Amino acid sequence: MTAPVVVGPGSGTSTMQFIMPKQFKRISDLPTPTDSRVSIREVPEAVYLVHQFSGNMGRGDGHDAIAERERMVAVEKVASEGGAFSEYVSADSKFLVARYDPPWTLPFLRTNELWFPVPLSPTEATAKLPTA
């Protein structure tokens, strides 16, 4: 199993993404899925604003009451801190849920994240970061 497992809404169903290890340089290096519901695709480089939290997550696409509560925590935190990326996180922002631990991990030891997409290139995002 790889970590994180990223879940989010899809077209009519939810999607689950596995981040492949660095040893796989090309899609052709990956094993061919044996289940027709599984597809392999390359996802372009992207920038996300990340909110990390611990606890138990629901099943499915991760967009449940826990994720919604954590989204509001992230929105309040970003709003109170201001900063260069506050315009990208709001109460209606879309997000992905990243889970890092196996199901048997105790909830208080689990690492979860909400990933809010930021429509900037990595270079543009880096330029917006505050300097020390």
Question: What would you call each of these model-derived segments?
Answer:
Residues 1-132:
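A solvent-exposed interaction/effector surface
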